[in-house]
């Protein structure tokens, strides 16, 4: 079987160096590649809110390092006072993106480490940094496992596939490698991929700007389409499978992901195409029985009526800008995790794995 190499071209959107964090500024891609220096927990919160860093797993990593920066800001040697201040910092970070459960998972993990550490504040801070490093390292390993299991879950026929994806789920959205795009990378490396169709993903265009950039950078053939073209492409038999990521998955498999995902799932079902969700188990919120309890972030209307400095719409009209929608589990063929690919009904069995 022919193989391709997309393995050694890694991107790391969150980087710790010299007691500060460096973030790839994803708002400037693809026209300009640059990093932003983050030196405080508040700066990290703003970076998450403004989507300098985005993607549920990457947000979790960034928030963990935001907690480390916050710990450096606290001026006390008393553990109780330190924990009180750290909790306030955690609350601020938790307010940034309400849908992405990895954010809350990482923050709670950091708080747990702080609470369970000994009384010395210096040791607590050291443990927090070590935990943030571990969260980052674990996510890379998790994404590679998702890529492996996703490759095995893909349809056996045709031998070479054309895959449609939505938003950006690659290295930029994770610690590195990616979830849904990680599966696509694995398929490309294994010689099973013809090309990727990338929805542009309005209103922020993460597919056109970020997924296309990642694929082109790695030599993976990619075709960008507008969101409204997806059904036509399926009807014309240009698509063999759909793979998306997730920001929060309920216990029954209902999945919140970038707005427009639900439409893709409905149309994929109508055309008898497999629809996969690729996400780490940290994205699964087992406390929610179904998707009705998932909070949906509402973002600024300017994201709809303006691109860059260009106004697209009359300003004397109303705008509605939910960042996510919820795809019912019944429309999902399989959920691909680091523990394997399962049906939505089987997801609950991975809770304690």
From Swiss-Prot:
EC number: 5.3.1.23
Pfam families linked to this entry: IF-2B (PF01008)
Pathway(s) per entry: Amino-acid biosynthesis; L-methionine biosynthesis via salvage pathway; L-methionine from S-methyl-5-thio-alpha-D-ribose 1-phosphate: step 1/6
GO biological process, one term: L-methionine salvage from methylthioadenosine
Site, Transition state stabilizer: residue positions: 167
Lineage top rank: taxon: Bacteria
Catalytic activity: 5-(methylsulfanyl)-alpha-D-ribose 1-phosphate = 5-(methylsulfanyl)-D-ribulose 1-phosphate
Gene3D superfamilies for this protein: translation initiation factor eif-2b, domain 1 (1.20.120.420), Translation initiation factor eif-2b, domain 2 (3.40.50.10470)
Record: residues binding substrate: 54-56, 97, 206, 257-258
Active-site residues from the entry: 247
SS bond partners: none
SUPFAM superfamilies the record matches: NagB/RpiA/CoA transferase-like
MF terms (GO), sorted A to Z: S-methyl-5-thioribose-1-phosphate isomerase activity
UniProt keywords, alphabetically: Amino-acid biosynthesis, Isomerase, Methionine biosynthesis
Matches recorded under InterPro entries: IF-2B-related, IF-M1Pi, IF_2B-like_C, Initiation_fac_2B_a/b/d, M1Pi_N, NagB/RpiA_transferase-like
Keyword Isomerase listed: yes
Family membership: Belongs to the eIF-2B alpha/beta/delta subunits family. MtnA subfamily.
Role description: Catalyzes the interconversion of methylthioribose-1-phosphate (MTR-1-P) into methylthioribulose-1-phosphate (MTRu-1-P).
Name of the protein this chain belongs to: Methylthioribose-1-phosphate isomerase
Origin species: Microcystis aeruginosa
High-level lineage: Bacteria, Bacillati, Cyanobacteriota, Cyanophyceae, Oscillatoriophycideae
